[in-house]
């Protein structure tokens, strides 16, 4: 067709030159145009006849005019190859990943799950570039959540998902393990995968111990089961050795330094009976021959006026090494009785040659003497002795600390060991008679009796 048009143009030029006329070339040009139009019509007709079976005519609207387009009548392409007709999930986010924040929306969740936020139980958002999951706080029934290969930085919205069982957060942007604190209140959480996050670092056992310490209910961490050994290491790592040592030392020092007020002093009216400066352990109970041999200077017997001595509950032991007798029990009554007994003994000045007998013991020598009626003293001794007998039958526990001079303990031991059963019975009868007579005395008379008893005690020593 193109060659024919060129041929007619050249022919009209030659005719105009040969005949030196203007009208003839115009006629030739008109003839050429009509001939070309006719040939074009024939060509289009033959083309339509051959291809009408394979093509269809579609009207495509363009504003107010219409144009005819010829489109293939074959089946439409698949969604994977035609992103315009079938948009992907990323078109439902607010913006592109490379430019601004990508926020998870309700419409995106609905496209994936075909249900409302309140009814979602499983949600897979792998590789969507999401960095805002605030909408997850509305998913109260959510059990399985996959957010791997995203840009999540905070787990705060997940603290409202109380039914969460599995959370997958691999390859995200978690900067600190403190974000796991938001998952502590999830009772059903058993599987967690946070590997390849900045907070993991190089990983290893230390990282696993930290995670297990925060979430002890986990059974699977980073696609690895959590064993009993992991739990033990997490517990041991949570209690530093220095803290354990300080706690043990503090408890031991409190036990050794605490002295009960009743063991330090006994008040009869305004008068202070006894004051103990440095405590030592006081033990009441049975003793064996081996113990008496090991501590001969620390063992003595206490003679209680008005009460018979028994072999089971009248022996007193002093020991300056608490570690060898941990577990012995000392009740308040026995300690108060000991303080009262020491207070009723007459004081003697310490001599230069007797200073070695006291060693590390320290008791005030200018202590006020006890002014107490003997009847009241007898009743007090009796009640204290009964309480001491009951206490001796109980299991041993930690006791209090008191002290007493070794020299006096030795003297008491000598006198108590030399007392015969007949003398004990006679002394009991005498004390009973004295108690009856003391009931007839007034306060002044009782004081005179106490003074006389103290003077005689000094003479006996």
From Swiss-Prot:
Keywords: Leucine-rich repeat, Repeat
Repeat region (LRR), residues: 119-140, 141-162, 163-184
UniProt superkingdom: Eukaryota
Domain LRRCT: 197-237
Entry's Gene Ontology BP terms: cytoskeleton organization
Pfam families: LRR_4 (PF12799)
Transmembrane segments: none
PANTHER family per UniProt: CILIA- AND FLAGELLA-ASSOCIATED PROTEIN 410-RELATED (PTHR18849:SF0), LEUCINE RICH REPEAT PROTEIN (PTHR18849)
Descriptive protein name: Uncharacterized protein F09G8.5
């Amino acid at each position: 067709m193109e060659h024919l048009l060129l041929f007619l143009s050249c022919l009209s030029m030659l005719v105009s030159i040969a005949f030196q006329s203007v009208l003839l070339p115009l006629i030739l040009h008109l003839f050429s145009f009509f001939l070309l139009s006719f040939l074009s019509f024939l060509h289009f007709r033959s083309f339509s006849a051959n291809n009408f079976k394979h093509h269809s005519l579609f009207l495509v609207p363009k504003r107010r005019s219409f144009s005819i387009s010829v489109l293939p009548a074959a089946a439409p392409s698949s969604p994977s190859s035609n992103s315009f007709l079938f948009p992907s999930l990323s078109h439902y986010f607010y913006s592109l990943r490379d430019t601004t924040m990508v926020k998870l929306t309700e419409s995106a969740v609905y496209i994936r799950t075909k249900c409302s936020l309140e009814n979602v139980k499983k949600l897979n958002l792998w590789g969507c570039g999401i960095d805002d999951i605030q909408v997850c706080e509305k998913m109260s029934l959510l059990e399985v959540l996959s957010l791997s290969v995203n840009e999540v930085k905070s787990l705060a919205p997940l603290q409202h998902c109380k039914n969460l069982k599995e959370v997958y957060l691999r390859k995200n942007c978690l900067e600190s393990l403190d974000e796991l604190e938001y998952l502590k209140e999830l009772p059903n959480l058993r599987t967690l995968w946070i590997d390849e996050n900045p907070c993991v670092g190089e990983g290893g056992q230390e990282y696993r111990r930290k995670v297990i310490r925060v979430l002890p209910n986990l059974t699977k961490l980073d696609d690895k089961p959590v064993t009993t050994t992991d739990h033990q290491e997490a517990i041991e790592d949570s209690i530093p050795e220095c803290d354990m040592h300080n706690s043990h030392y503090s408890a031991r020092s409190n036990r050794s330094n605490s002295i009960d007020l009743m063991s330090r002093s006994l008040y009869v009216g305004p008068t202070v009976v006894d004051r103990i400066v440095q405590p030592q352990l006081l033990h009441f109970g049975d003793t064996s021959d081996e113990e008496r041999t090991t501590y001969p200077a620390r063992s003595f017997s206490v003679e209680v006026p008005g009460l018979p001595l028994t072999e089971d509950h009248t022996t007193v032991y002093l020991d300056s090494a608490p570690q060898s007798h941990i577990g012995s029990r000392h009740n308040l009554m026995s300690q108060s009785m000991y303080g009262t007994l020491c207070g009723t003994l007459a004081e003697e000045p310490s001599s230069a040659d007797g200073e070695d007998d006291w060693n590390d013991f320290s008791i005030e020598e200018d202590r006020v003497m006890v002014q107490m009626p003997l009847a009241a003293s007898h009743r007090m001794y009796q009640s204290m002795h009964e309480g001491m007998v009951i206490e001796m039958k109980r299991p041993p526990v930690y006791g209090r600390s008191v002290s007493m001079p070794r020299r006096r303990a030795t003297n008491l031991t000598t006198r108590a060991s030399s007392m015969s059963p007949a003398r004990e019975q006679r002394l009991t009868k005498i004390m009973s008679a004295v108690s009856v007579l003391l009931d007839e005395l007034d306060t002044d008379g009782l004081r005179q009796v106490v003074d006389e008893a103290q003077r005689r005690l000094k003479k006996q020593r």
